[in-house]
Amino acid sequence: MMVENWPAKPEGSQWTDDQWKAVVAHGRDILVAAAAGSGKTAVLVERIIKKIINEENPVDVDRLLVVTFTNAAAQEMKNRIGEALEKVLIEEPSSRHIRKQLSLLNKASISTIHSFCLQVIRSYYYMLDIDPRFRIANQTENELLKEEVLDDILEEEYGMEENQLFFELVDRYTSDRNDDDLQRMILALHTAAGAHPNPEKWLDRLVEAYNVEGKTIEDLMYASYLLEDVKFQLETATEHIRKAMELAMLPDGPAPRMETLQTDLVLLETLSHAARKSWTSVYEAMQHVSWQTLKRIKKSDYNEDIVKQVDSLRNKAKDEVKKLQEELFSRKPESFLRDFQEMHPVLGKLVQLVKEFSNRFQAIKRDKGMVDFTDLEHFCLQILSEQGEDGELRPSPVALQYRNRFAEVLVDEYQDTNFVQESIIKLVTKDSEQEGNLFMVGDVKQSIYRFRLAEPGLFLGKYKRFTQEGLEGGMKIDLAKNFRSRHEVLAGTNFIFKQIMGEEVGEIEYDADAELKLGASYPEGEDVAAELLCIHQSEEEVLDGEEGEEVEKAQLEARLIAQRIKAMVDSGYTVYDRKTNEMRQVQYRDFVILLRSMPWAPQIMEELKLQGIPVYAELATGYFEATEVNIMMNVFRVIDNPVQDIPLAAVLRSPIVGLNDEELAMLRAHAKKGSFYEVMRSFLRGAPLEGGKELHEKLKWFYHLLQGWREFARQQSLSDLIWKVYRETGYYDFVGGLPGGKQRQANLRVLYDRARQYEATSFRGLFRFLRFIERILERGDDMGTARALGEQEDVVRIMTIHKSKGLEFPVVFVAGLGRRFNTQDLMQRFLLHKDFGFGSQFIDPRKRIKYTTLSQLAIKRKMKRELIAEEMRVLYVALTRAKEKLILIGTVKDKEKEMEKWLDTREHTEWLLPDYVRASASCYLDWIAPSLYRHRDSEILLELGQGTIPNEIYEYDTSWKVEFVDGKTLLAPEPAQEEKQELLEALREKKAVPLESERKDEVYNRLTWKYEYEDATLQRAKQSVTEIKRNYQSEDGSDTAFIQKLRAPIRTRPRFMEKKGLTYAERGTAVHAVMQHVDLKQSITIESIQEQIAKMVNKEILTFEQAEEISVERIVAFFESHLGKRVLEAKSVEREVPFTMMLSAKEAYQNWQGKSEETILVQGVIDCMIEEDDGITLIDFKTDTIEGKFPGGFDQAKPILEERYKVQLSLYAKALEKTLQHPVKEKCLYFFDGNHVITIEE
C-alpha cells in the first residue's frame, strides 16, 4: 500500500510527523530508530490502539504479538493499552468491540520473548520430549547442575586408557594444580553456542575453521580481517607523519626534518600498498622496513616545543609499524598455518566434550523436569521450525498457524535481540520485508547488552538496508526528537558524539538523522550548563598500589559529588515539575549518580552519609557479610553439625546466647580437650560451678533449643525451621531494634525466601542448603542486601548505567569517567567470537613454549573494536538520562600528561576525531576531554585560543563548564565536620553539651511533630461500595452483603454445611446469578425460567441445592412488574457491570478528619443498567426480608430501606455518569420479597 493511503495526521495533533508515520505506516517491515526520550513507548501503544479501533479493518488485541525486553515493560505496555482503551470506551460507551478488547487484554501476547516461548512450549509440549509440568530452573541450581555434569564427564575422560587427544587437550589448557581453565572453556563454548539457532552447526563451523589442509594464509578469514586492521594502523602511522610534516613546515618548525619525514611517508605508502594486495605481500614488505636516522639539528634555532611534537609524532608512527611487525609479521605465513594444523584435532576433541556436556546437561534437566532460559528459546525454535534440504530453518505447520494468527508482530528494544530470538520472530512473521508485518522499535546507540549475547548488528544491518520510503524492501523511520531533556543536555551530548561516534570506530554513524533534537519545552533555568569536572590527583595523595589509587579516586569524586549536591539543595536550586508545570526546589530524589560498575558505590555512599545526605544503592554484594545473616548461617551450621567449633563459638558469643569472653573462657577451661559442643554437654551434665550459674542457665536454654531444632530439621521443611529459629530466639525482633533494623529484618526475610526458593528446586535438606550457599560464595555470587526502600523515598540514588537505562532524572552525575575500560575478557587464555569462533595461544607442552595464534590475534582485535563501540553506547545511555543538569566527573593522576594527550587533536579540522584517537581510548575521559577541548567554553582554550578549530565546532551552540579541581582542596577537613567531631567526643564522655544551637527549634519540632495524614493511616485506601454503605448505616440483620467485584461461579458447599439451608447471603447470591444469566430474549414464564435454571445447574453456574432454593415465582413477578417490563423493552441492558473509581475520602468516611484532597479507590458491581430513549436507569436487586418483619408493612419499611441504600445507589450512579458521560435519570431498588420498587431521590 502506498504512503498516501495512510491516515492523515489530525489537525492539532501533538504527534510529530515522524511519530505519526510510525503510528500509521504499514504494509511492509518497519524499523523505527527511536532516540533516547523520543516517546517510543507512546508511539508503540498508539500504533496498537489504532490497529484495534481501525474502522475498516479492526484487529483484536490477541492477534498482535508484542515483544518487550523485560516483564516490567510488558506490564507497563498492557497498562497503557488498557488505559487508552478505557478512554476510547468513554467516547464510545456502546462499543462491544472495545469491551471485547479489554476482556482480551489479559491474555494478549504482550510479553518478553521468553514468556512467548513459554506460551508456545506449554501449548505444544507434546512435540518435545519434556514433562508438561516442567519448571524454570533457578540460576544457581542450574550452575550447580552444570558443575556436577562436567565433573562426571571429566572424571570419565580421565579414567579412559586410550584417550590421547583428551590428555593433549588437558596438557595444553590446564595448569599443574587443576583443570579449571578446561572447565571454563567447555562452559563458555556451551553458552556461546546457545546464542545461535543451531548450536551444533556453529560448533562444527568453529572446528572446520582450523582445517587448513590445501589452504594458504590468504584463504583464512582471520588473515582477511587482520589485513583490514593492518591498513587502519598504517593509516594511523601515516596520519602521524603527515601531521609531523605540517609542524615541520611552520615558521619555527624543524624544516631539516622534512627530508626524513618524506622518506618515512614513502615507506608507509609502500606498506599500505602491500596491505591492499595480500598478507604475504605485507609480510615481505615488513622484512625490509628501515627507518632513516634523523639528522642532527641545532635545537636553539627552532621552537623547542614544535621539535618535540615532530619527534613524538614520528616515534608514534614507528611504534605503530613496530607493533605490526612484532605481533603479526614476525612469523612466516606457513608458521601460522602449522598452528592450525596442530590445534585442529585438539579443538575437535574440545568441541566433542562440549556436545557431550550439552546432551547430558539436557538429559539431567529433563529428568528433573526443569528448563532454563536458553532452553525456552531453543525449544520454541524447535517447535516453530523445520530444517530444509539446504540446512536452513523453515517455518513448521505450528509457525504457519502463528503467522495466520498474528496480524502484526511488534518488537520493542529490537537492538538487544540475539540470533535465536531473531529466528523465532522471523518464523512467525511474513517472509517478505517488502510486504511484511514486522514492526521493530529500538535505538542501536543504546544497545549495551552484548555481554548477554545481544546482537546490535541485526539492527544495524536492517537500518542500512531499509529506506525512508520503503519502496524496495523495509522502511526505516527516525524518531530523533527528545521530549525528556533541556537543550543544554541534548546539545552537550550531540557535541560529544558528533566527534567520537563513527562507523569505523563505534559501528554507528552519528549523522544528522542520529542527532538528538529538542522536543521538550522548559522554562528558563539558572545554572543549567553541562559540566565536566576533572579532579587532579596529586602524587602525594595517591595511596600505595593500584587498589589504593582506585580507593583514593573514589573518595575524591565522592567528596566532590557530596559537596555539589549539598550546595544545590542548600542554595534552593530549582527543577521543573511536569505535574504542576512549575519550577520547584530540588529534592534528594532528583539526583542520581551513575557508575559503569559498582565497586565505588560503598565509598560514595559513606561520603554522602557523612555529609548528611540520604543515599541508596542496590549493591550486588555484602548480603552474606551482614552480621545478622552471618550469625543465622552459623546457627544453621550448628544445627546441621554441632561439632564445629567456630560456628558454635560464634553463636554462643552472639546476642542469641549472649556469652561474654569470660564465660567462653570458663566453658573452655572446663575441659581442655574435645570440641566446644562436647565441652558444653559435659558442662551441663555437672552441677553449676561457683559463679557459673548464669552461664549454666544460658547454655541449658540454648542446648534445649538446639536439640529441638535438630529434630525439627529432620522432619520438617527448611523454611519452617528458619522461621522457628527466628521466633524461638526472638532474634528477628531483636535486630529490628538495632540501628538499620528495617534493613536487617529485610535481610533475614530474604534468607527465609531463599530457603523457600531452594526447596522448590531439585535439592533438599539443611546440609545441601548450606553446601548450596557455600558454592554460591565460592563462585563469588554473593547477593546484595535486601531492598528496604520505597521507590518514592527522598534519597540520592547510586546505580550502574545499565540499571539506569529507560529511566530519567533531573540532575545526573556520571562519575568514574577516568577509570580504565574493563578489558579482562581480552586477556583470557582463550577467546570466543560469534563470527571468528575460537582463538587461543598455541601451547606446546613438550617444548614448554606458547605464543599467540592468528585466530587469537584476529578475535582479540575484533573484540577490542566491539568493546570500544559498546562503551560508546554505554556513555550515550549515561548522558541521555539527564533531564535538566548533567555533571561529568573524572579523576586523572598526571594532569600535564593527560592534557597533552587530549590537546593532541585540537588542530583537527573535521567534526569526527581521528580514528586512532577514538580507537585507542582507555577511558571515557579520553573521548570527552578531546571533544570539549575544541569548544570555546573550555577554560584551557582561553589561554590557547581558537587556532585552526573550525567555527562550527568552536562556536557550537552548547553550554559547558570545563574545569580542573585540585584533589588537595577536596580532602581538606571542613570546619563543620570538626565541630561535629567535638560534639561526638563530648557525648561519648557523657559531658553536657550546650543547648544553644541553630538547630534547637528544628529538634524541638521533630520531637513534637504530628503526622498530618494520620487519619489516612487509620482507613483503607480501597473500599467496596457495600463497605462504604455500612460506614453510613449500621447493619440491622436484614441486609445481605453479597456484592463483589466479580461474582465467581457458585461452588459446592463444604460437607459440614451441606445439610443446612442456605444462608441469606448464599440465597441472595444465587438470585443475583439467575438475574445475571436469564435470557431476556425468551418469553418469561415459570416454565421457561425453570428450564433456564436447570441449564445454569448443568453449566455449574448454580448448584442443584441452590437452584431448589430459588423462588421462580418471584423472578417471574419481577418481569411482570412495570419495572421488569421496562427491562425487557429497553434499547440495551447491561447486567453485573463492575466498576472502579476514585472518590473523595470525605464522601467515603463520615468522620473523616484528614486532608480534604485525599482520595480512595472504590469498587463495586451494578446489578442492572437499562438504556431507554429518555436516558439511563440504574436497578439494584435486593433479597432483604420485608414481609412480616415490619409491623407497619412496606409503608414503615420504605423510609428505612431508602435511607439504608441511598449512599450505595448514589455511588453507583456517580460511577455510571463518570464512565458513560451521561446522567442517570432514575435509581431504583427492587425487593423480591413483596415485589416492591423504591425510587431513590436525591
UniProtKB/Swiss-Prot annotation:
Q: Name one GO biological process term.
A: double-strand break repair via homologous recombination
CDD domains listed in its UniProt record: DEXQc_UvrD, SF1_C_UvrD
Q: Which UniProt keywords are given for this protein, alphabetically ordered?
A: ATP-binding, DNA damage, DNA repair, DNA-binding, Exonuclease, Helicase, Hydrolase, Isomerase, Nuclease, Nucleotide-binding
Checking Gene3D superfamilies in the record gives:
3.90.320.10, P-loop containing nucleotide triphosphate hydrolases
Q: Which residues form the UvrD-like helicase ATP-binding domain?
A: 13-486
UvrD-like helicase C-terminal domain: which residues? 506-806
Catalysis performed (reactions): Couples ATP hydrolysis with the unwinding of duplex DNA by translocating in the 3'-5' direction; ATP + H2O = ADP + phosphate + H(+)
Q: What GO molecular function annotations does the UniProt record carry, in alphabetical order?
A: 3'-5' DNA helicase activity; 3'-5' exonuclease activity; ATP binding; ATP hydrolysis activity; double-stranded DNA binding
Residues that hold ATP according to the record = 34-41
Named cofactor requirement(s): Mg(2+)
Q: Which superkingdom?
A: Bacteria
Gene Ontology CC? cytosol; DNA helicase complex
Quaternary structure? Heterodimer of AddA and AddB/RexB.
Give a short account of what the protein does: The heterodimer acts as both an ATP-dependent DNA helicase and an ATP-dependent, dual-direction single-stranded exonuclease. Recognizes the chi site generating a DNA molecule suitable for the initiation of homologous recombination. The AddA nuclease domain is required for chi fragment generation; this subunit has the helicase and 3' -> 5' nuclease activities.
- Write out the similarity annotation: Belongs to the helicase family. AddA subfamily.
Q: What is this protein called?
A: ATP-dependent helicase/nuclease subunit A
